[in-house]
A protein has these predicted regions:
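N-terminal accessory targeting/assembly segments
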Residues: 1-15, 26
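C-terminal-of-GTPase-core extension/linker across diverse P-loop GTPases
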Residues: 12, 17, 28-150, 156, ...
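Terminal RNA-binding accessory module
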Residues: 123, 154-157, 183, 193-194
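Inter-motif core of Ras-like GTPase G domains
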Residues: 175-199
Length: 343
């Protein structure tokens, strides 16, 4: 039905994609983003850009092709201002893609730390019920425990992992396999919550974990804030986006963590009712358009109006592909392959 609506001109391609996004959205914010796209928010924004670029291209073509006619001269200052505005608009759309994807589909979040630092307690706090077994015995969690939770505006697919520590050659083979899986999950995660015991001094395992988190979307949680602090957070701070003292046994920690996650992932800056890009197809087309506009801007400052015109043509082609006006049959088929029968 959605494909038929697209082929009959009732829906644009971005609106058709929004139907599937709405069906598969995780949480209210993701649904709001999809609903905005279904209402035409993205299409209207892109169409406005196309109208400005088309008007600019017509002026350029008239000036270049009919120099003997009384065509108003193309002002370099106005040209640069128009192209800069177009580039900035596309930059904003592209910059918001990652956070929008998180709101739409959620993010895989791994809980990592030494044994008995409070990872499973954290999982239970975020889940809102006793999902994992918690005991004073180190190494209680040996395999990965999964749980999806809604944390503020973000859906987290949580993975509580085995405590990471050094296991000798003659150590427990099951625990060693659990630790191997923990490190593997770190490499796959879109978000890392690294847990440290605030009542103890940092260990070699703590520092190794911190170093492995460097350059990744990671938050350090120094747990057991309710006990005297012995942990020197400055030793791990360089490796994390932020370091938070928390007590995972207190409900208030959930709000603190939710705010930090939203800040790190950029979801707190997203207006769910505004235009946003969804999926690699849209991102790729918008990126090509942005690069073409940037090329036109460079050309306007040295190469001449012919080069500007070529780049503006490329930008218009990319924007028309984004909205579906000149999308190939293969692209259209790929979009609608995501739909199940009856949608």
């Amino acid at each position: 039905y959605t494909r038929r609506a697209f082929l009959n001109g009732k829906l644009g391609l971005t609106q058709a994609e929004a139907v599937m996004d709405l069906i598969s959205a995780d949480g209210r914010q993701g649904a709001a983003l999809a609903n905005a796209a279904l209402g035409g928010a993205l299409a209207k924004k892109i169409n406005a850009q196309k109208a400005q670029l088309t008007a600019l291209q017509a002026h350029l073509a008239a000036w270049v092709d009919f120099p003997e006619e009384d065509v108003p001269e193309v002002s370099q200052a106005e040209l640069i201002a128009t192209l800069s505005e177009q580039r900035d608009t596309l930059d904003q759309l592209i910059a918001g893609y990652g956070a929008g994807a998180v709101l739409r589909r959620g993010v895989d979040c791994v809980l990592l730390g030494r044994p008995n630092v409070g990872k499973s307690t954290l999982l239970n706090l975020l889940a809102g019920f006793d999902r994992a077994i918690v005991t004073p015995v180190a190494g209680t969690t040996r395999d990965i425990v999964e749980q999806a939770v809604q944390l503020g505006s973000v859906r987290l697919n949580l993975f509580d992992t085995a405590g990471v520590r050094e296991v000798g050659a003659d150590g427990d083979a099951i625990e060693a396999e659990g630790i191997r899986r923990s490190w593997k999950k770190l490499d796959e995660a879109g978000l890392i919550l690294a847990v440290f015991d605030g009542s103890e001094r940092p260990t070699r395992e703590d520092l190794e974990l911190a170093q492995r988190c460097a350059g990744r979307p990671a938050i350090a949680l120094v747990n057991k804030e309710d006990k005297p602090t012995r942990f020197d957070a400055e030793l791990i701070a360089p490796y994390f986006a932020m370091v938070l003292p928390v007590c995972c046994q207190e409900e208030g920690a959930r709000k603190v963590i939710a705010a930090a996650v939203a800040r790190l992932l950029g979801t707190s800056q997203i207006d769910p009712h505004a235009a946003s890009l969804s999926g690699q197809r849209q991102l790729s087309a918008a990126t090509r358009a942005r690069d073409a506009v940037a090329g036109a801007l460079d050309a306007a400052q040295g190469l001449g109006l012919d080069a500007v015109s070529v780049c503006v043509d490329d930008a218009l082609d990319a924007l028309c592909e984004l909205t579906g006006e000149n999308a190939s049959e293969a692209v259209i088929n790929e979009v609608f392959e995501r739909f199940c029968v009856g949608k």
